[in-house]
Amino acid sequence: MFTRKIQKTALAMLISGAMAGTAYAAPEVLADFHGEMGGCDSCHVSDKGGVTNDNLTHENGQCVSCHGDLKELAAAAPKDKVSPHKSHLIGEIACTSCHKGHEKSVAYCDACHSFGFDMPFGGKWERKFVPVDADKAAQDKAIAAGVKETTDVVIIGSGGAGLAAAVSARDAGAKVILLEKEPIPGGNTKLAAGGMNAAETKPQAKLGIEDKKQIMIDDTMKGGRNINDPELVKVLANNSSDSIDWLTSMGADMTDVGRMGGASVNRSHRPTGGAGVGAHVAQVLWDNAVKRGTDIRLNSRVVRILEDASGKVTGVLVKGEYTGYYVIKADAVVIAAGGFAKNNERVSKYDPKLKGFKATNHPGATGDGLDVALQAGAATRDLEYIQAHPTYSPAGGVMITEAVRGNGAIVVNREGNRFMNEITTRDKASAAILQQKGESAYLVFDDSIRKSLKAIEGYVHLNIVKEGKTIEELAKQIDVPAAELAKTVTAYNGFVKSGKDAQFERPDLPRELVVAPFYALEIAPAVHHTMGGLVIDTKAEVKSEKTGKPITGLYAAGEVTGGVHGANRLGGNAISDIVTYGRIAGASAAKFAKDN
């Protein structure tokens, strides 16, 4: 094994040799470099015939022994620069998530961003979509080879729904294996920034906010154009406060309460100071899933759900990135693999006007969960309803949380004018922005809003926020008419004072924009959420397309399902959905496994 001293010496020799003009063929990948410096043993357990598991546990341990862990590397990074080791990602991020041994290393950050990191032995990010039924002959061979492992419950996906299901199933006494195809856990949940909608909660009561679960039901149905499954919506709202309590009991901070588009009342819960909710919730769930002994496997793609002759689920076929195909026998399977917003070919199939749009999602949101469920005969609904989030930053490659608007920001076009109610539903906001010149707009806010929402600091760090000491100076920064922007802000401040938006009937007017400096950032719609998916009941059981009855042993939760959000999801309802239905799916699956 390398010591850190030996590792540094080896790199120094490599660099000095190159600088001295020594005839030297530089290694192209990490395996070549380590092979020269210490042989395969420097990474692998040589007597085990290669890798020991798809998490590359041993290999990552070797990396840490030489280079230090992620916290050490983050601490050593320059404080004034974006560092790949200072991340919003959750879980125990492995070195091999980015640094590959036998192929070009690729910064996972580049799946969303364009930081241009100078990565050793690096290559360009690209992701090819491979159908789950590709290489069918090899899959059939693995199935014929028989069962490799047995468990009570298999969970597909490590986002909020999958992690909530894992915690819930473990608490119900089930043995759980959670499978994640990506090298990074957390799914879309780790990217969610706004909040978690819940009604009649303790944080609301403490802040004097009066809300009712029925109002949340009504808002959700109205936002979804009333095509939601009303029974699923009732479960969402009626269990929402309990889900807040459940998260809080495990260490989550959900004490800050704001408002998202389409809500009649402040009910969007998030950490103190308005920090991003998703990464926080995902980390809490991850920590608790690990604490409970959940077997979590990354780089592990489920390519088939297995059933017996009667149609009962019997397990899954997995393709490990390094270990290959193998079968896990399970009494129950929970699909929590998310939606397909990152698969534009599929998105544009259902909604052609979204062809070529960017997406706010993580790279794994390609629709695998739907594919394996369809193979198993599952029913689907509402697949044509796909949401574009109105505030995506083209410059930063990130979604700008709806909470910026909720806390008082306005949206202006290139003429410096407001053109909509900023906290309308996402579908209406996106449509309004696409009608403006350049099909984009600007969020404008002041320093009081910046100080009210910690999430904004991340956007500042990405250098996508423009700043001016005055509104007129800010207008020059974003190239809009200064007089018009000043007029717009003055008019809006008057609406705040009077308590009524005479232009666009914005229902919530939190604050005037008067505290310098002033800020703006460009926004445009991007594909964000796929409302349609698998048909489930209130127990999270997946229904059969053929019979309309539950498929025995198959459950689902989160964005992979349809019916909760109807034609349009309200901001803040996704986290509520994944936590509440993740809990239900995990408990239902565990109970079924125990009873059968």
Curated annotation (Swiss-Prot):
Cofactors demanded by this protein: FAD; heme c
Binding site for succinate: G194, H389, T401, E402, H528, R569, G572
GO MF annotation list: FMN binding; metal ion binding; oxidoreductase activity
EC number: 1.3.2.4
Residues where FAD binds: A161, E180, N188, T189, A193, G194, G195, V302, D368, H529, E559, A574, I575
Induction: Induced under anaerobic conditions in the presence of fumarate.
Major subcellular site: periplasm
Listed Pfam families: Cytochrom_c3_2 (PF14537), FAD_binding_2 (PF00890)
InterPro entries with a match to the protein in the record: FAD-dep_OxRdtase_2_FAD-bd (IPR003953), FAD-oxidoreductase_2 (IPR050315), FAD/NAD-bd_sf (IPR036188), Flavocytochrome_c (IPR010960), Multihaem_cyt_sf (IPR036280), Succ_DH/fumarate_Rdtase_cat_sf (IPR027477), Tetrahaem_cytochrome (IPR012286)
Catalytic reaction(s) noted: 2 Fe(III)-[cytochrome c] + succinate = fumarate + 2 Fe(II)-[cytochrome c] + 2 H(+)
Binding site for heme c 1: C40, C43, H44, G101, H102
Chain positions recorded as heme c 4 binding sites: H88, C109, C112, H113
Phenotype upon gene inactivation: Mutants reduce more ferric iron than the wild type, but this reduction is not coupled to an accelerated growth. Selenite reduction by the mutant is severely suppressed, with a 60% decrease in the reduction rate within the initial 12 hours.
Binding site for heme c 2: H34, C63, C66, H67, R225
Annotated binding of fumarate, by residue: G194, T401, E402, H528, R569, G572
Similarity-based family: In the C-terminal section; belongs to the FAD-dependent oxidoreductase 2 family. FRD/SDH subfamily.
Stated role: Flavocytochrome that catalyzes the reduction of fumarate to succinate. Is essential for fumarate respiration during anaerobic growth, acting as the terminal reductase. Receives electrons from the membrane-bound tetraheme c-type cytochrome CymA. Under ferric iron-reducing conditions, can be part of an electron transport chain to ferric iron, by accepting electrons from CymA and transfering them to the c-type cytochrome MtrA. Also plays an important role in the reduction of selenite to elemental selenium. May act as a transient electron storage protein.
Subunit text: Monomer.
Protein name: Fumarate reductase (cytochrome)
